[in-house]
Design a protein with these regions (language model features):
Chain B
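Proline-aspartate-enriched helix->loop->beta-strand connector
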Residues: 135, 361-370
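Redox- and metal-dependent alpha/beta enzyme cores, enriched for Fe-S-associated oxidoreductases
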Residues: 69-70, 75-105, 283-358, 362
Length: 383, 429
């Protein structure tokens, strides 16, 4: 079965989609968020649609450049640019956490320049949660309180009588199912003869983040059946790559890699394994919110967690073996200090393990395709 | 090699720094008139004596503790140790050494440290990569920026130095102060375990008391800076920042500020301006050019432009009550730590920062703001335009934005700075 013009997968190429329109027609709210370090199940239990902010398709950042200097992340700038042009006017709420210096400042810029701009009259509630930068018991207690406060703020802002434990448990079930389905699809790409490409897998992940999870689960089940019955992809003449680093919500980039003689057999991305690797463990059924918070806090981290580099390295080592990769492609969006330094350490650590590594920097939009292609092709040839 | 030499070789950059300080002070003594640039004359002398004593202590074998500039140095006085500020080492050597710190930046860049990360850390990292620093432990808050969070793990994972991370919340509420107080206490206890020392609370209190007094004096100095013309030279800004970093919590810092207060009072009384005539009063809400602090003197003398203060000088916190119980003391330390230069602005939302700037502009009769946006400081990368609009709307004064690297002249040179500011000043006069 061809997934070329699949309706679900095509959601990944736009921001707004028919599912969001249907959702809002029935007077339900959409809350935008930047980073996977938020308790999505809590929003779901509040009958809100969590929508991960991205800038898919954005080519310019000239409006956002007025407010953000050129040393900031071009992905975040592109999202602001899109928002300044009205691309996020459909949001009914906005949740920011201190994931990184770039996205954290969107709390103020959206407040002042997007939601308060002329002729935009909708009142959009904004929420902020502060996440510790280390993984400790005290840090968890802090974050738990933050999430509990967020729950109260959501109830107040959207006049919800109570986000009950029953609702939270139901959301946990739906989200765990969602992550399980994504892991199943991931397994199909890990195979020696994979059923889908890395670019297709990225499409699935992006689409999954943009629609209600109940529908997404149905779609993912359908995709799994379709993939299983599909002919395997011949990647025998390609090099298997583990793609690591900054956010990738742009298919141009993964296609560029896969058109250069590589197959993205696995990843360590937030539109990838970092999102679905860990489930909520129902250790304490009386406090589902605590279980949700534990998953977010203790899950496989991104480099914004300062003391967790070795666990990330272990994850890479496991994934290198599981996906039988020939090399690791580390990438960062320019000005991302977090991924830049984590990748610096990975480069040396992986070289010591004799794993071929390429460490590249790029802009969010594909402004330097030839340079990237040359470097990636040279790397592929080398391994 | 003797133990003394071996021990001393743990802080070779401090030896280089001391030599640079000695040479600088010799030049000051020989070239400048007796009353010229008192902050530099007095400040370098005080810093020099303390650095010399640190080198001796390191040679005796005391533990060398690396720390982040935003971890108040007086808190480390609870240990018998040699505190080494990583960021200040990079930047003060950038300003004092003839070739700056660029060799060490390049070394780290070659090792894979991204070009857009902070040179204040890059320099010290390069020195450490070359084994010029050997720390017994390093302590840092998990703030104020991504560069800190991203760069410090290098010391742990590449060089195997014990790294104590003191988690600092990105939120200013009462619960944040309590949380950070606990973090500070457990961080210091953890550091003590690593170096095999108990916390000496008596010494800690003494150091805090000294800084309480320094804070009070700085308040007085800042009240005098409100006068037109400003009675203090521009170089006071970097020198007092350096004084805090290198001699904070010590009697030398107190005597430096006492002497500066007397000089400031005298100039205020005589309506004297260091540069001769004050033509423009500027506030630098962010950083100065650490790769060349002599820009400050040039602005004073050549343009009559006063730099009333920069980010490292305008943060004041409540005095810490050292007569209370330990929990209260740690709470006070937490509040000071969270109100520290750059930490405060980075872990709060923009509104308080912009409001402070507006009120500073009014209180200090500023004619303009000069906002230097350093390549590393992403947490400040979204504020310039908002601040510019607010200053024009609320106070009617302009703001010049200059993008640069605070510790590396190769990005925006001193010449470019001078040209940009000269043209800007022409539009004001």
């Amino acid at each position: 079965m061809s997934l070329k013009n699949d309706f679900f997968l095509n959601i990944s190429t736009s921001i707004i989609n028919p599912y969001i329109e249907d959702w809002q027609k029935s007077n339900r709210k959409v809350v935008g968020y930047y980073c996977t370090y938020i308790p999505e199940e809590l929003l779901h239990a509040a009958e809100l649609l969590p929508f991960r902010i991205r800038a898919t398709g954005t080519k310019d950042t000239d409006l956002a450049d007025i407010y953000m200097v050129r040393f900031t992340c071009s992905f975040v700038r592109a999202t602001l640019d899109l928002a300044l042009r009205g691309g996020y006017d459909f949001l009914d709420g906005f949740l920011v956490c201190n994931s990184c210096d770039h996205s954290r400042r969107m709390f103020e810029l959206f407040n002042l320049k997007v939601f308060n701009r002329e002729n935009f009259n909708k009142k959009v509630p904004q929420f902020y949660i502060a996440l510790p930068h280390v993984i400790t018991d005290e840090g968890f207690e802090w974050y738990k309180k933050e999430v509990e406060e967020l729950k109260e703020e959501l109830e107040k802002a959207y006049q919800i009588k109570e986000i009950t434990n029953e609702k939270l448990l139901k959301s946990i079930h739906i989200y765990n199912e969602n992550r399980k389905l994504l892991r199943s699809i991931h397994e199909l790409r890990l195979q020696e003869k994979p059923k889908l490409t890395g670019s297709e897998f990225l499409k699935i992940n992006i689409a999954n983040s943009s629609i209600p999870k109940e529908i997404a689960n149905q779609e993912l089940n359908r995709i799994i059946i379709a993939l299983k019955s599909r002919k395997s992809i011949d990647v025998s003449n390609k090099k298997r790559i583990l793609l690591v680093g900054s956010i990738v919500d742009n298919l141009d980039f993964t296609q560029l890699i896969e058109n250069s003689g590589a197959f993205i057999a696995s990843d360590f991305l937030c539109f990838g394994t970092r999102y679905f690797y860990d489930d909520v463990q129902l250790v304490n059924r009386d406090d589902p919110l605590e279980n949700i918070t534990k998953r977010v806090y203790y899950r496989i981290s991104c480099p914004r967690m300062m003391d967790d580099h070795l666990r990330r390295l272990d994850f890479l080592k496991e994934e290198i073996n599981r996906a039988k990769v020939d090399g690791v492609l580390l990438q960062r969006i320019n000005n991302c200090d977090l991924h830049g330094c984590d990748n610096m350490l990975f480069t040396h650590e992986l070289k010591e393990l004799d794993v071929p590594v390429l460490n590249i920097d790029r802009e969010f939009y594909q402004s330097d395709t030839t340079r990237l292609q040359t470097r990636i092709e040279a790397f592929i040839e080398m391994i | 090699m003797s133990n003394k030499n071996q021990n001393g070789n743990r802080i070779i950059p401090y030896k280089m720094f001391l030599k640079a300080l000695l040479t600088t002070r010799e030049l000051i003594e020989r070239i400048l008139p007796k009353q010229g640039v008192p902050s530099l004359r007095i400040g370098t002398k005080k810093i020099e004596s303390v650095i010399a004593s640190y080198i001796e202590k390191a040679e005796e074998g005391l533990p060398v503790i690396g720390y982040h500039f935003s971890f108040p140095v007086e808190y480390l006085k609870c240990f018998d140790c040699v505190p080494v500020c990583l960021e200040a080492t990079s930047y003060f050597m950038a300003t004092l050494l003839e070739g700056g710190t660029e060799n060490y930046y390049d070394l780290m860049n070659s090792w894979g440290h991204p070009f857009h990360t902070c040179t204040s850390q890059k320099g010290a990292m390069g020195m450490t990569l070359e084994d010029l620093f050997k720390f017994d432990a390093i302590i840092t808050p998990t703030a104020p920026c991504d560069c800190t969070i991203a760069s410090y793990p290098f010391f742990k994972y590449k060089k195997n130095f014990p790294l104590v991370m003191v988690d600092l919340p990105f939120l200013h509420e009462e619960k944040s102060y309590l949380y950070y107080a606990d973090q500070l206490k457990s961080g210091l206890l953890n550091l003590g375990k690593i170096i095999g020392q108990d916390l000496n609370y008596k010494k800690l209190k003494e150091a805090i008391d000294i800084e309480n007094q320094v804070n009070k004096i700085k308040f007085e100095i800042f009240d005098l800076i409100k006068a037109v013309p400003s009675p203090i030279e521009n170089l006071y800004n970097p020198v007092s920042a350096g004084a805090y970093i290198f001699i904070g919590g010590m009697p030398e810092n107190l005597s430096f500020h006492k002497e500066m207060l007397e000089i400031t009072k005298l100039r205020y009384k005589n309506k004297e301006h260091h540069g001769g005539e004050e033509k423009v009063r500027s506030i630098w809400p962010y950083m100065i050019t650490w790769f060349s602090i002599d820009l400050m003197e040039w602005l004073d003398r050549n343009l009559g432009l006063s730099v009333l203060f920069d980010i490292f000088n305008y943060n004041f916190s409540e005095p810490i009550n050292t007569n209370s119980d330990l929990d209260t003391i740690f709470l006070g330390m937490s509040k000071k730590g969270m109100d520290f230069s750059m930490i405060k602005q980075s872990t709060e939302f923009f509104e308080p920062f912009i409001e402070y700037c507006i009120s500073f502009a009014k209180e200090f009769s500023a004619d303009c703001f000069i906002y230097t946006q350093s390549i590393a400081c992403k947490q400040f990368g979204s504020v310039p335009q908002l601040l510019k609009e607010a200053l024009m709307d609320e106070v009617g004064i302009p703001m010049l934005l200059i993008e640069f690297d605070a510790g590396d002249a190769r990005m925006t040179s001193l010449k470019t700075f001078k040209e940009k500011i000269s043209i800007f000043v022409q539009t004001l006069i």
